[in-house]
C-alpha cells in the first residue's frame, strides 16, 4: 500500500508574511503522517524560515527547483548542498515551466535527480505532454521518454524513494483537467515503464502523483484510481482550507 502524497507548488506566489501565516494555519490541522505525506514547495527565499516554523509539525517543506552542482559560478541558482543545509525534504525537478521557460533538458534533470538523492532530498520528477502531443496520440511515448531519461543510471532501491508527477502541460493552470480514467491510464503507463527499467517491486513501490488543475471537487475521483498516489497541486495549495481538504481526501482515499 503506497502512502498518498499531496505536494503544494506555490510557484511565484505569496509574500514572506503570507507564507508564514499559511504554515501557521495548517500545521496543527494536518491528517496523520501515517496516512498522507503533506508537502509545501515554497519560493526559495522562504525555505529556511518555513522549515523552522513547521519543525514541530508533520508538514514537509520542499524547493521548486535546484542546480545539480554543489557550488560554483551559477548566478541566481541554488545548490542541493544549500537546500540540504537548511533541512529541505523535497525538490520539484523537471516541471514543465522550467523545461519551457528555462530550457531544462532531460540530461540536466537526470543530473539534478542524482544530486538530490546524494543529499537525501526526495525528488519529485515531473513529466507530461503538450496538447498537440495528446491530440497526436503520443502521450505515453512522450512521458515514457522523459521518465527513462530521468531515471537513467539509478538502482532500483533509489527509485523506490522517488516521487513521479504526471502533469499534462495543457492542464496546468488552465482549469482543464484530464479525466480520472485518462490520468490513471498514463500513471499506469509510467508504472509500466518503471517495471520495464527495474522490476515489478520497484514499480509497485514508487509513488505517482497527478497534477493539473487539481481541486477539492475533483481530487476524490482522481485519488480513487489504482495508479494515482497523490497530487502535485498549484492554485489549490495557496489557501489553507483547500489544501487541508486535499489532504483529508488523500488520507481517506
UniProtKB/Swiss-Prot annotation:
Pfam families: TIM (PF00121). The keyword Phosphoprotein applies. One of its GO terms (molecular function) is triose-phosphate isomerase activity. Its main location: cytoplasm. InterPro entries: Aldolase_TIM (IPR013785), TIM_sf (IPR035990), TrioseP_Isoase_bac/euk (IPR022896), Triosephosphate_isomerase (IPR000652), Triosephosphate_isomerase_AS (IPR020861). It is found in: Cytoplasm. The keyword DNA repair does not apply. Disulfide bonds: none annotated. Substrate binds at residues 9-11, 173, 213, 234-235. It comes from the Bacteria. It is an enzyme of class 5 (isomerase). The active site is at residues 95, 167. Its EC number is 5.3.1.1. PROSITE patterns: TIM_1, TIM_2. GO terms for biological process: gluconeogenesis; glyceraldehyde-3-phosphate biosynthetic process; glycerol catabolic process; glycolytic process. SUPFAM superfamilies: Triosephosphate isomerase (TIM). Pathway: Carbohydrate biosynthesis; gluconeogenesis; Carbohydrate degradation; glycolysis; D-glyceraldehyde 3-phosphate from glycerone phosphate: step 1/1. CDD domains: TIM. The modification Phosphoserine is found at residue 213. It catalyses: D-glyceraldehyde 3-phosphate = dihydroxyacetone phosphate. Belongs to the triosephosphate isomerase family. HAMAP family: TIM_B. NCBIfam families: tim. Involved in the gluconeogenesis. Catalyzes stereospecifically the conversion of dihydroxyacetone phosphate (DHAP) to D-glyceraldehyde-3-phosphate (G3P). PANTHER family: TRIOSEPHOSPHATE ISOMERASE (PTHR21139:SF42). This is Triosephosphate isomerase. It comes from Lysinibacillus sphaericus (strain C3-41). The lineage of its organism: Bacteria, Bacillati, Bacillota, Bacilli, Bacillales.
Amino acid at each position: 500500500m503506497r502512502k498518498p502524497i499531496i505536494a503544494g507548488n506555490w510557484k511565484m506566489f505569496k509574500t514572506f508574511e503570507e507564507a508564514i501565516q499559511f504554515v501557521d494555519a495548517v500545521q496543527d490541522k494536518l491528517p496523520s503522517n501515517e496516512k498522507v505525506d503533506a508537502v509545501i514547495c515554497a519560493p526559495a527565499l522562504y525555505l529556511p524560515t518555513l522549515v523552522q516554523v513547521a519543525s514541530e509539525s508533520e508538514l514537509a517543506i520542499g524547493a521548486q527547483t535546484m542546480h545539480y552542482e554543489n557550488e560554483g559560478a551559477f548566478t541566481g541558482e541554488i545548490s542541493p548542498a544549500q537546500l540540504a543545509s537548511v533541512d529541505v525534504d523535497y525538490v520539484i525537478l523537471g516541471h514543465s515551466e522550467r523545461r519551457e521557460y528555462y530550457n531544462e533538458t532531460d540530461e540536466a534533470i537526470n543530473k539534478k535527480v542524482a544530486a538530490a538523492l546524494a543529499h537525501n532530498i526526495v525528488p519529485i520528477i515531473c513529466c507530461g505532454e503538450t496538447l498537440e502531443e495528446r491530440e497526436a496520440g503520443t502521450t505515453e511515448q512522450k512521458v515514457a521518454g522523459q521518465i527513462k531519461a530521468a531515471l537513467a543510471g539509478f538502482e532500483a532501491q533509489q527509485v523506490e524513494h522517488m516521487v513521479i508527477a504526471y502533469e499534462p502541460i495543457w492542464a496546468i493552470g488552465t482549469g482543464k483537467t484530464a479525466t480520472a480514467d485518462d490520468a490513471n491510464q498514463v500513471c499506469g503507463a509510467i508504472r509500466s515503464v518503471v517495471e520495464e527499467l527495474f522490476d515489478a517491486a520497484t514499480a509497485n513501490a514508487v509513488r505517482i502523483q497527478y497534477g493539473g488543475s487539481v481541486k477539492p471537487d475533483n481530487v476524490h475521483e482522481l485519488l480513487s484510481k489504482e495508479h494515482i498516489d497523490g497530487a502535485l497541486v498549484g492554485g489549490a495549495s495557496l489557501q489553507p482550507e483547500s489544501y487541508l481538504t486535499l489532504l483529508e481526501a488523500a488520507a481517506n482515499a
